[in-house]
């Protein structure tokens, strides 16, 4: 009997208080959205990318980290006239050879396909110049020079000074000592959330979503137990 009365009270509340019903539904949807988004962030801490951007700087630089570069010798021929130059600050390691205490310049021209580019950009050339100094800096500056529309259009990583980027030169032959470029796995190259920050956001969204769902449940229980329809007065019944 009590369950029937509680259900009847809840039905009357739904019928006579539409604003309260709308507010409850909004809270319910927010709670479900928080649970869904929080679960997604906890299960997809890596690999989050916009489907509208075919190539981003993270994958671009990781492809670059698989290449091999050689020191440039003193002979210079010609100038590189790439109209689009981007200077990026990275923490790439250029090896620990005998010349690691000297300032070195590494330079290479690679096809877009070697950098993970596809379509018409795969056949375009990209000039990459890196100047490794002996100073204890926060990272290594890389200069990418190419025609417009080749380099990634996503938000760039932390940029560095572009001084000397326009003076990049091509060498007719490379030195004998080449090094492999590599980066630590999971290196954060762009201003994105780390896996720890994603986990924190996901857990907080789960807590918020659970709280909203519990609040909606508590609101329904209180309404079912305490809501009583207003009795019609004798004067109202007489007028009817």
Swiss-Prot record:
Glycans are attached at residues 73, 101, 167. It is found in: Cell membrane. The chain crosses the membrane at residues 205-225. Residues 1-38 form the signal peptide. Cell death receptor specific for IGFBP3, may mediate caspase-8-dependent apoptosis upon ligand binding. Interacts with IGFBP3. Interacts with CASP8. PANTHER family: INSULIN-LIKE GROWTH FACTOR-BINDING PROTEIN 3 RECEPTOR, TRANSMEMBRANE PROTEIN 248-LIKE. This is Insulin-like growth factor-binding protein 3 receptor. The lineage of its organism: Eukaryota, Metazoa, Chordata, Craniata, Vertebrata.
